């Protein structure tokens, strides 16, 4: 297969790197980790070559990773509810939490893009709540 090269926003790149770092911490299967580590190395290399980091960007990345870590836990908890066919108050709370955290995640990614002058920006628009 040919290599696919696409331009992405800095926020999207850091989001993906943060998720891969979480996977490296959570996933234990050596075969899966081999692919995760490879993808992480490729993306991290592109970040280091193409993005000038500073304290603000480091802080935004840390916050983005914290949000993604919370989302990981929530999604695991939702799967347990699914497994137990429990779609009551806890499932509803978890599902709502995903919306709120994803809104925060989008704001952080946009802030990263604005801070770094990224040409590409992920723009979101949802019904207000």
Protein language model regions, located:
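Extended, charge-rich alpha-helical interface modules
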Residues: 1-129
